[in-house]
Amino acid sequence: MEKREFKAESKRLLDIVINSIYTNREIFLRELISNASDAIDKVYYKTLGDSSLTFNKDDYYIKIKPNKEERTLTISDKGIGMTEKELDENLGVIAKSGSLQFKKENEIKDGFDIIGQFGVGFYSGFLVADKITVITKAFGADKAYKWESDGVDGYTISEAEKDSFGTDIILHLKANDEDENYDEFLEEYKLKSLIKKYSDFIRYPIKLDVTKSRVKEGTENEHEEYVEEETVNSMVPLWRRNKNELTDDDYNNFYVEKRFGFDKPLRHMHISVDGMISYNSILYIPENIPYDYYTKEYEKGLELYSNGVLIMEKCSELLPDYFGFVKGIVDSQDLSLNISREMLQHDRQLSRIAKNIKTKIKNELESMMKNDRESYEKFYKSFGRQLKYGVYDDFGMNKDELKDLLMFYSSKEKKMVSLAEYVERMAEDQKYIYYAVGESNERIEKMPQTEMVLDKGYEILYFTEDVDEFAIKMLMNYKEKEFKSVSSGDLGIESEEENKKENEENKGIFEAMKEALGEKISAVKASSRLKNYPVCLSSEGEVSIEMEKILSAMPNNQGVKAQKVLEVNTNHEVFNSLKDALENDKDKFNLYTKLLYNQALLVEGLSIENPVDFTNDICKLMK
């Protein structure tokens, strides 16, 4: 029996296969089952071109046989088998794909699904085995052959005995060590779990002898174990079935079976695409937030399949972060079964699929907002924050993609409205989209800064989440209408002449108030927005008061401060008390000014810088 060397570069390639392409040992079974499925496919294709041959699918299956005594695992198929020449060419040259060659020689169109076209899957067996034996008999041949190798010193090919065509791959498992327990791949539960995980949708039955228990004949309570051959895989992927044959229950049951969630999904999408890219997909939009969704532990991603064989449990490259809540699967014939996570990042087909999926999700959400508002509001309550993060993230790169999906509570409608709905009903003389920021709708409704805007009959959007104002600052405008905080210095509705006159007339008292407060504020001015309140705070520049609150609460904050302006209602009776105090008692004037400033801080939800001084000032006032 002649010892043959692997072809040139094959030793180096074998090392790459074992140590680089495959980073997870357990996928060896997936690879060998996929090869077995391909081998049966080839028999089927042969029969299509020869009327004298028949193909009865019930006769074809894949058998997994563990042997604990000999520490071997055998994967058998009734596939096309290999001749001596094919053994030498296909298994003697690493990264040569017999399936790809078969497609070329038989001019098979891409519609014929053969899983393995990369040519390295067989060698994944060396992840768990220190020797592999292959016994094979080619379809229509008289002789069988045995190929054997330890993966290091080449291989041997010799004649063998085999009754029917097909292939047996016998893995002689490595010895256990401190890091790996290879015996687990001989355990029934482990083999079943790997088949269900990676190869559940292989189109031929995968059979395994399973130990079961039953009541022993002639007894009532005595049990005995027996072995029964069982088909482990379900074979038909839901996503490849006709949509018209499926019910909501089918989709909901699949959602639970795949453990995407334990409640009913809010929406499902069944996608089939053929053209520049080809893939099938079932996607789900959950109704409720996963308990860990807004934590570092949460992993986004879709299950990724190649021809029904699982490549990756969570392929994050298929979803942008702002759609990270979507669950589901993607199956494509255009992806290599052996693709690694590193290779995925540069895979053009995957990028095209991801782009298409992103568009499908956006269209589904837009349709839900338009045609099923109640469901969309449920979704938005759970995941609206994620969309707003998407607007703000990456320097606003995705803001145009997401702006039409945003919703905020409306002062006028008393419910959630979209930006498009707000703009459609804006008054002709209204320059801006007005918003107010606060901890809750109730707090915002009591804000003194809203009085003037509401008196004009203008609608205000309520921002109650930390990310809201950051997202809107990044968005800047919507349909050419700029956003304006009700707390900003210029609302665009005040009379400039009246403001100028008011500030000139009270210049002295405002300068005295500024002097009393020092660097706490950048200016004091007359307010045209206040009716019932004596003072309020507004801001100038890009950083609002609410943004300062959020930034200051963050770890390692940089001490970013808003440029605060104290606005004074000159028509309020308190203002008369201020003027009297300035003329008659400067200390009392300073006391009043500080109290009013602290009052404005409290109304704004800001903390008082020195609570002890504040309480002492109140006591002085009461004397």
From Swiss-Prot:
Q: Where in the cell is it found?
A: Cytoplasm
Q: CDD domains recorded for this chain?
A: HATPase_Hsp90-like (cd16927)
Q: What ranges does the record give for the region C, renumbered to this chain?
A: 550-623
Q: Which family does it belong to?
A: Belongs to the heat shock protein 90 family.
* The UniProt record lists the keyword Membrane: no
Please name one Pfam family that this protein belongs to. HATPase_c_3
Region (B) location = 342-549
Q: Where is this region: A?
A: 1-341
According to its UniProt entry, the function of this protein is described as:
Molecular chaperone. Has ATPase activity.
Query: Which SUPFAM superfamilies does the UniProt record give?
Result: ATPase domain of HSP90 chaperone/DNA topoisomerase II/histidine kinase (SSF55874), HSP90 C-terminal domain (SSF110942), Ribosomal protein S5 domain 2-like (SSF54211)
Any one GO CC term of this protein is: cytoplasm
Q: Which UniProt keywords apply?
A: ATP-binding, Chaperone, Cytoplasm, Nucleotide-binding, Stress response
The annotated subunit structure for this chain is: Homodimer.
Q: Which PANTHER family match?
A: HEAT SHOCK PROTEIN 90 FAMILY MEMBER (PTHR11528)
| Organism in which the protein naturally occurs | Clostridium perfringens (strain 13 / Type A)
The yes or no answer to whether the keyword Cell membrane is present is no
GO molecular function, one example?
A: ATP hydrolysis activity
Q: Report the protein name in the record.
A: Chaperone protein HtpG
